């Protein structure tokens, strides 16, 4: 069975790529807050590179920070920590993003008429087909009407599935907090 840290790392890797994993792993291994300078020293890389990685991780919810002002210099010091306890919320947010994209695509499919090239399966909106006299731009073949009912049905099914997952996971999360 995969442990929570491995799942957390794999999720970060799939969303942000390998580049941020070294910073995330250091924070997980340390188990306490660290400054960007401490991380840079341990990884032997530039502080600016660490900050870029931390900002990417923070945008997706993998890490968070608290800031304090240095009494001597007046500069802010950022203390970073991993949000491994937020893994479910990160996944939920990702599902919501995917759901929005699927709904946008479904609207596009519903609101447009399409034509397809029988030779190379290139798909054109009505406007594109009309501009090109209903001929394929690649091979010149006559375009034929393309019925998008299967695509719309598939998108509707996926949307329902993800909505049910989000609803179920949101209720589970709410029950854990009580």
UniProtKB/Swiss-Prot annotation:
Molecular function in Gene Ontology: DNA binding
Highest rank taxon of the organism: Archaea
SMART domains cross-referenced by the UniProt entry: TFIIE
Keywords: DNA-binding, Transcription, Transcription regulation
Disulfide bonds: none
Chain ranges of the HTH TFE/IIEalpha-type domain: 4-88
Pfam families the UniProt entry points to: TFIIE_alpha (PF02002)
InterPro entries, A to Z: TF_E_archaea, TFE, TFIIE/TFIIEa_HTH, TFIIE_asu, TFIIEa/SarR/Rpc3_HTH_dom, WH-like_DNA-bd_sf, WH_DNA-bd_sf
Gene Ontology biological process terms, A to Z: regulation of DNA-templated transcription; transcription initiation at RNA polymerase II promoter
PANTHER family for the chain: GENERAL TRANSCRIPTION FACTOR IIE SUBUNIT 1 (PTHR13097:SF7), TRANSCRIPTION INITIATION FACTOR IIE, ALPHA SUBUNIT (PTHR13097)
Task of the protein: Transcription factor that plays a role in the activation of archaeal genes transcribed by RNA polymerase. Facilitates transcription initiation by enhancing TATA-box recognition by TATA-box-binding protein (Tbp), and transcription factor B (Tfb) and RNA polymerase recruitment. Not absolutely required for transcription in vitro, but particularly important in cases where Tbp or Tfb function is not optimal. It dynamically alters the nucleic acid-binding properties of RNA polymerases by stabilizing the initiation complex and destabilizing elongation complexes.
Protein family (similarity comment): Belongs to the TFE family.
Domain notes: The winged helix domain is involved in binding to DNA in the preinitiation complex.
Subunit structure: Monomer. Interaction with RNA polymerase subunits RpoF and RpoE is necessary for Tfe stimulatory transcription activity. Able to interact with Tbp and RNA polymerase in the absence of DNA promoter. Interacts both with the preinitiation and elongation complexes.
Protein name per UniProt: Transcription factor E
Organism lineage string: Archaea, Thermoproteota, Thermoprotei, Sulfolobales, Sulfolobaceae
């Amino acid at each position: 069975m995969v442990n929570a840290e491995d799942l957390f790392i794999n999720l970060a890797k799939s969303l942000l790529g390998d580049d941020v994993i070294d910073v995330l792993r250091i924070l997980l291994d340390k188990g306490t807050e660290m400054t960007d300078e401490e991380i840079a020293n341990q990884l032997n890389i530039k502080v600016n590179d660490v900050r870029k990685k931390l900002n990417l991780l923070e945008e997706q919810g993998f890490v968070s920070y608290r800031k304090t002002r240095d009494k001597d210099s007046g500069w802010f010091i950022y203390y970073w920590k991993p949000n491994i306890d937020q893994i479910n919320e990160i996944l939920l947010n990702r599902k919501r993003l995917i759901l929005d994209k699927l709904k946008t695509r479904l609207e596009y499919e519903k609101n447009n008429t399409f034509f397809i090239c029988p030779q190379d399966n290139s798909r054109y909106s009505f406007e594109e087909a009309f501009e090109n006299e209903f001929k394929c731009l690649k091979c010149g073949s006559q375009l034929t009407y393309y019925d998008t009912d299967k695509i719309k049905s598939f998108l509707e099914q996926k949307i329902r599935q993800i909505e049910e997952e989000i609803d179920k996971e949101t209720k589970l999360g709410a029950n854990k907090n009580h």
